[in-house]
Amino acid sequence: MRHGRRWWLLLGLLGALAMAPRAAEAQEFDLGAGADYWTQSPGMGIFSFGLDALWRVAPGIQLGFKPGFFLTTSGDVPAGIPLDFKVRVNVSSVYVDGFIGPWFFFKGDVARIHVGMGAGLRLGRLLLGGEVSYLNNGATFGGRIGFQL
């Protein structure tokens, strides 16, 4: 084999390796929105927007995180940034999520714990579901809609 051919073979091999999927890359991204009722006195609405980044760790099981942004219907606590770590179990077209993480508020108690679970249906690239969680001094109940990117 001539020296020039070896060079092209090596270059082709490096190109194929560069384009191969890497284990460190997220395998699924979901862009979503939600609306919740928060029972903290006197009760308020929360509208959230987030991007799930998920990695498959076993068949039907994914781990990931969900950064985002939220707005509330209260002037006392107007907005913030949620950062949930999550586990998702997929069974056919049904998914179940468990999550925990800090929510950072722009006013008042800056960091609050968020723990909960959700479930829903995967209809092609569309995800429809619900969620129940605990956020600091009250429960949240709401719906979710998402789109797999």
Give the role of each language-model region.
Residues A139:
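N-terminal glycine-rich cofactor-binding segment
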Residues R6-W7, Y37, L54, P102:
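Residues in intrinsically disordered, low-complexity segments of regulatory proteins
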